[in-house]
Amino acid sequence: MADYTNYTNKEMQAVTIAKQIKNGQVVTVGTGLPLIGASVAKRVYAPDCHIIVESGLMDCSPVEVPRSVGDLRFMAHCGCIWPNVRFVGFEINEYLHKANRLIAFIGGAQIDPYGNVNSTSIGDYHHPKTRFTGSGGANGIATYSNTIIMMQHEKRRFMNKIDYVTSPGWIDGPGGRERLGLPGDVGPQLVVTDKGILKFDEKTKRMYLAAYYPTSSPEDVLENTGFDLDVSKAVELEAPDPAVIKLIREEIDPGQAFIQVPTEAK
């Protein structure tokens, strides 16, 4: 018999994402964990949120998680397919930035204490050890939107100084965005990792640990962070509702495209 109390950290991460989404918000997602989280939000926590996808799909309600942004499973359950897909992200972000309703998900290989994200390269830019796919739409999203950043919590990823700034966060603290001509009233709101939730101090704009998973601890988070991190405000999150874990496994991602279910939990 399936054990829905035996959850994985990725499932916890997806549920944590879902709980950050509110009714009335417009949510920009791609695929993977952010999409699973947004799908859970739409089904459970925020049925009146509106999911949009960078390929031009508006107000999506996927039954089963699509594998890519062009997957037909997206198109079967969406309110509108915008033909001008190349510019949709920037047009929508600019419009919704003014309405302050948009929340968007981005990720990367490295992040610094102010939420600047690198998804371009590791090492010297001109002679990199590793070259990634780059910004895609993430730079435009991070410029004009409030963002939730998805990361694996490892010391090599949480760095005091990242190798390249692909997507701007709070730059170097208060006023940093404005000095570069970026909107100062939007920026990274949360970092959701496989260990917990990190937020940004309103005054300093520096990251701090807000909450940690039952499977983690403040000490565990510190051990896997490459810069000084305030953990004094951190609280332990509740374990996810088994009914939501069942929903993820049986309806949203039954093929385990993005979340692998442990054998003992099947």
UniProtKB/Swiss-Prot annotation:
<dbReference type="InterPro" id="IPR004165">
    <property type="entry name" value="CoA_trans_fam_I"/>
</dbReference>
<protein>
    <recommendedName>
        <fullName>Glutaconate CoA-transferase subunit B</fullName>
        <ecNumber>2.8.3.12</ecNumber>
    </recommendedName>
</protein>
<comment type="similarity">
    <text>Belongs to the 3-oxoacid CoA-transferase subunit B family.</text>
</comment>
<keyword id="KW-0808">Transferase</keyword>
<comment type="pathway">
    <text>Amino-acid degradation; L-glutamate degradation via hydroxyglutarate pathway; crotonoyl-CoA from L-glutamate: step 3/5.</text>
</comment>
<dbReference type="Pfam" id="PF01144">
    <property type="entry name" value="CoA_trans"/>
</dbReference>
<feature type="active site">
    <location>
        <position position="54"/>
    </location>
</feature>
<dbReference type="GO" id="GO:0018730">
    <property type="term" value="F:glutaconate CoA-transferase activity"/>
</dbReference>
<keyword id="KW-0963">Cytoplasm</keyword>
<dbReference type="InterPro" id="IPR037171">
    <property type="entry name" value="NagB/RpiA_transferase-like"/>
</dbReference>
<dbReference type="GO" id="GO:0005737">
    <property type="term" value="C:cytoplasm"/>
</dbReference>
<comment type="function">
    <text>Catalyzes the transfer of the CoA moiety from acetyl-CoA to (R)-2-hydroxyglutarate and related compounds like glutaconate.</text>
</comment>
<dbReference type="GO" id="GO:0019552">
    <property type="term" value="P:glutamate catabolic process via 2-hydroxyglutarate"/>
</dbReference>
<comment type="subunit">
    <text>Heterooctamer of four A and four B subunits.</text>
</comment>
